[in-house]
Amino acid sequence: MNQYTFKELNLAPALYRAVEKEGYEVPTPIQIATIPPLMEGRDVIGCAQTGTGKTAAFALPILHKIATDRPRPSAKSATVLVLTPTRELAAQVGDSFKKYGKLLNLRHSLVFGGVGQWPQ
């Protein structure tokens, strides 16, 4: 497999800067395999080991679409819903969206079961 850079994936400039800020230098194999088709609007099923960048593999294309769609989605409506099997994974995915989307001026919420409504 060729050595790609995040710049070659044609991410929105704000996302590319966020990726650089996180210290990511080159995309992982799962990111190379999934980001381009997801950015084209195609469906993808990906499978990779823990710690290989799967969250970025789907979060970056989602955030890219939000960043580049015109007009921007309404601030009063949900644009994306990510479901995870555990609270811990939900928190990790939420943190990733927050980090990657920081320069996009987006709002995100984390909701999970097993606790009262107000702590969330």
Ranges and model annotations:
Residues 2-120:
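SF2 DExD/H RNA helicase N-terminal ATP-binding lobe
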